[in-house]
């Protein structure tokens, strides 16, 4: 999260202040790698509420994405090229280790074991999809959206339980969009929005159930926004004034737009319009700056520099 935030903020001084802490965290995780190449961790996102083993998929994926973002941030911090190469190599090796260590068949689905020895589906198998690891995208989404995991209130934390946390449902929706499964994702997002924002428990996403009795937390509302920004529009910071776009326009939509995005020390719009069955036109307009247009296939990667 930190390198994504620093890049998107466009604040060089803040990045210089926090870069040493980020480097420390990356080195700490690197020193925690086990013989199989994945980081060991005595806890995870759920802080011991459910089993996580000695090495879990959540920690591994978060570390992986931190390395990827660090390859963009390191040159801006004046680091030698060798540092960027090291982070890139470590990310490549970790991605392969995630597949070897966690990849497998669970409850008949070609997806991920949350930890070594895990034999039931877990909600956080969605995380690889959020970070561009799509080798098992179809099987993972089939599992998450199956009756074994999907309920009226979102995705269960663990197959066979009655516990749900909105954050994993929101990450799964973001991952579904990011992996190119936009039609299924928008269907599930529509149901979620009707249930949460317009239904019996309004007007925000909730934290969990039964713990906390569905109280509201601002973090979940932030994750809802990230379904749109990082999932549907596929925005990924690559510099203080640059980002990549991987726009996923659902087949039933003719257009979509985000207006007045405040990021990269700028104010800009992104609009996607369908121009043919296989092409969309993406327009990026910066207030007081240039307008750029791209005609691409849905999900095609675009590199944007704001100027």
Protein language model regions, located:
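Short, tandemly repeated low-complexity microdomains enriched for cysteine and small residues
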Residues: 241-244
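Hydrophobic/aromatic-rich effector regions of fungal transcription factors
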Residues: 1-8
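Active-site core of glycosidic bond-cleaving carbohydrate-active enzymes
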Residues: 8, 13-27, 48, 52-85, ...
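Short, well-ordered surface patches within globular domains
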Residues: 96
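Short, conserved phosphate-binding/catalytic loop or strand-edge motifs used
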Residues: 43-47
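Acidic, glycine-anchored loop motifs typical of Ca2+
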Residues: 37-39
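Beta-rich accessory regions
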Residues: 80, 86-89, 93, 101, ...
């Amino acid at each position: 999260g930190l390198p994504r935030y620093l890049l998107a903020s466009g604040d060089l001084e803040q990045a210089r202040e926090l870069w040493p802490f980020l480097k420390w965290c990356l080195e700490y995780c690197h020193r925690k790698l086990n013989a199989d190449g994945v980081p060991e961790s005595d806890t995870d996102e759920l802080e011991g509420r459910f089993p996580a083993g000695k090495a879990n998929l959540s920690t591994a994926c978060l570390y992986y994405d931190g390395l990827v973002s660090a390859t963009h941030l390191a040159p801006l911090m004046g680091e030698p090229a060798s540092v960027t190469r090291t982070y890139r190599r470590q990310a490549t090796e970790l991605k392969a280790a995630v597949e070897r260590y966690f990849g497998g068949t669970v409850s008949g689905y070609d997806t991920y074991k949350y930890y070594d020895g895990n034999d039931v589906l877990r909600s956080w198998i969605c995380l690889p999809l959020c970070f561009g690891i799509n080798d098992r995208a179809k099987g993972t989404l089939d599992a998450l959206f199956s009756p074994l995991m999907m309920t009226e209130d979102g995705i269960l934390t663990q197959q066979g339980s009655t516990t749900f946390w909105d954050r994993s449902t929101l990450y799964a929706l973001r991952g579904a969009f990011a992996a190119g499964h936009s039609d299924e994702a928008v269907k599930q997002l529509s149901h979620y929005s009707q249930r949460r924002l317009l239904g019996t428990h309004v007007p925000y996403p909730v934290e969990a159930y039964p713990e906390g009795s569905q109280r509201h937390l601002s973090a979940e509302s932030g994750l809802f926004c990230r379904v749109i920004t990082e999932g549907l529009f596929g925005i990924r910071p690559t510099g203080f004034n640059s980002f990549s776009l991987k726009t996923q326009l659902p087949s039933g939509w003719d257009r979509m737009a985000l207006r007045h995005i405040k990021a990269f020390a700028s104010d800009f719009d992104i609009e996607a319009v369908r121009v043919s069955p296989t092409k969309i036109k993406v327009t990026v307009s910066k207030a007081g700056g240039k307008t750029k247009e791209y005609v691409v296939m849905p999900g095609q990667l675009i590199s944007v520099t704001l100027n």
